[in-house]
Amino acid sequence: MGLRVNVSAIFMAVLLTLQTPTGQIHWGNLSKIGVVGIGSASYKVMTRSSHQSLVIKLMPNTTLLNNCTRVEIAEYRRLLRTVLEPIRDALNAMTQNIRPVQIVASSRRHKRFAGVVLAGAALGVATAAQITAGIALHQSMLNSQAIDNLRASLETTNQAIEAIRQTGQEMILAVQGVQDYINNELIPSMNQLSCDLIGQKLGLKLLRYYTEILSLFGPSLRDPISAEISIQALSYVLGGDINKVLEKLGYSGGDLLGILESRGIKARITHVDTESYFIVLSIAYPTLSEIKGVIVHRLEGVSYNIGSQEWYTTVPKYVATQGYLISNFDESSCTFMPEGTVCSQNALYPMSPLLQECLRGSTKSCARTLVSGSFGNRFILSQGNLIANCASILCKCYTTGTIINQDPDKILTHIAADHCPVVEVNGVTIQVGSRRYPDAVYLHRIDLGPPISLERLDVGTSLGSAIAKLEDAKELLESSDQILRSMKGLSSTSIVYILIAVCLGGLIGIPALICCCRGRCNKRENKLVCQDQA
């Protein structure tokens, strides 16, 4: 009974082994052709953004300094108008041509909001991005009553950062970049400084703040509707304390660093007030969703030598795995951090079956190309071992002072502590660890993939050759088509007669040929007999 159980257990173990995939990426085989993985991370995608209003109060509260700063405040207002008025006019041109659409319900005779419509004829020319941003602008802008309440609240506040809660609406955060300087520096020193000096100090501070405003909103002058402002740029106007602003906005995401590095938090202008000098921004900050099971791998390649030629394996810089699937990975919209990979959109797209076979360990499926010019990597440290192309660079054992040679039948050299604890390669001294890779990769023990060319001239030449061959094949196909068309012109009875004639000719010709051959053979035999008798 025990033997039967053991046999059953062994059978199940073997069955599970056969059904279990051997793994997504075969790092062992890839290392033989100079490809190693230098990092893996989780995959996160930004999802739908949440919105919060932020007010930048450009004019500080100078009630206690009015007698000393009137000239500076007047000049500062003039400068602000040069920035704010073009933005206000562009916003008004868009919002005045967007109106709500209402429908009348059939059951109850009342109107219900259905959406907004853009008056394209009145607007004239607008890009798709501007139209989309204009609709979003209409949806996020405040109504006139809210603007009046906000203006009244801003005129009375003298805080650098203050939360203003509108009636029946969400909280609005108001920020003034110069107010702290006025409250903490100028007002306490009014008794020690002259009025002129206080005015000069405030004037310099306002001028500096104006340059920051201009650098932040200057690009918006060209396209105020669709221009977006990153939270990093916004932090300069907010006094540099970005954490305090995000905390006031209610953002408590655990992936704040990733969103900041990927510039996922954006701000867009929704209102400009040239009476009280403030700007209303709609800030969109997304949340991150981790795609479970997806791992992003970074690949790095090392060149290797075949005789006197230097090659390297052509593989993507980043790939992604999910279960047994391997996908290409577009890193253009992503930010890489130790905690994971953050992307603003889906970065996965299908990979060719041949490249998947290559990454799964079939080295003969991995394309290779000749090294031309300066190549980045001729050595790399992986798992504490040094993988080096010692045929192209100088490898030296620093411990013993001897040169590490690479035989012609080797394409790469793997150096570990059992061979040389401290290695000097290309002028860099590296201490290596215990062996994780074989000593060397021999050419006769590995199947290399097809050579390809990535140079523009070589690719053009190869394409020209391929086109010429296609033209030759096209001519042959055309000639064969002509033969087929001529065959189509023959009737079926003609084809039958031709076949009968060929068969009759064969029946008559073959016996005649046999008779001729026999006659010649008989003549040769008679000649030989006569010569023997003579």
UniProtKB/Swiss-Prot annotation:
Region (HRA): 139-215
Region (Fusion peptide): 113-138
BP-aspect Gene Ontology terms: fusion of virus membrane with host plasma membrane; symbiont entry into host cell
InterPro entries found in the cross-reference section: Fusion_F0_Paramyxovir
Region listing for HRC, in residue ranges: 69-95
PTM note: The inactive precursor F0 is glycosylated and proteolytically cleaved into F1 and F2 to be functionally active. The cleavage is mediated by host furin during the transport and maturation of the polypeptide.
Oligomeric form and interacting partners: Homotrimer of disulfide-linked F1-F2.
UniProt name for this protein: Fusion glycoprotein F0
